[in-house]
Amino acid sequence: MPMKNSTLNQLVENDKQMALKDFRQIPGVGKSISEDLWNLGLRSVSDLENQDPEALYTRLSALQGTHVDRCMLYVFRCAVYYASNDVHDAELLKWWNWKD
């Protein structure tokens, strides 16, 4: 018997909420940026491993149809660093330390 749309929608929403919570463990990532990561098609912190922060930034700008503040690139650099390394330098977990 096929799932009802409401059941499927609830499953998707549950998955989304779990992913958003997962993203918020990354320093500098809150509700808004976790939504941006979801909208980029990422579903877990591990999806950020070895991603190109510049490409994520460019894709987000295209998705939103506007220029995104450059600080978002710095957050993406920090997030990719966090996801790609098991041991972290505390200074590199501050997004502002990823400026050009």
Can you say where each PLM-predicted feature lies in the sequence?
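C-terminal extensions
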Residues: 2-27, 31-100
